[in-house]
Amino acid sequence: MPREPILIVDDNPVNLKLVRVLLAGAGYDARTASDAEEALEVLREFRPKLILMDIQLPGMDGLELTRRLKANPETRGIVVLALTAYAMKGDDKRTLEAGCDGYISKPVDTRTLPATIEQYLSRDATHGGRET
């Protein structure tokens, strides 16, 4: 049985491929987008349960995209985990204020990423999604 659909949004092609291959190997239906506009295009046809969102994207950044997704009744229930290479003080607060459900620092720990994703998906299923 296939696992949950996931969208990975990152402007670094190496990161996109690494995470997609890792998640596909764990049984997830993983799709990718290299910027916010492409992510919005993918979301017209693909409804992920979770988005791994790079917060530093060209054009519209990942936090603004998250705000838009959480403001839209059709996409607000998608779990969004922020990805950033800059684990600076205050980043976790900024990502949560934008509507992200969690925060993962880059480089991604390939040993724990599938389990981390499973935890967030299980938590979302238990709570029936966010009501905000």
What spans do the regions from the language model cover?
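Conserved phosphotransfer cores of two-component systems
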Residues: R44-F46, R68-I78, A98
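The feature encodes the CheY-like receiver
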Residues: L16, P58, R76, M88, ...
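Charged docking surfaces used in two-component/phosphorelay signaling
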Residues: K17-G25
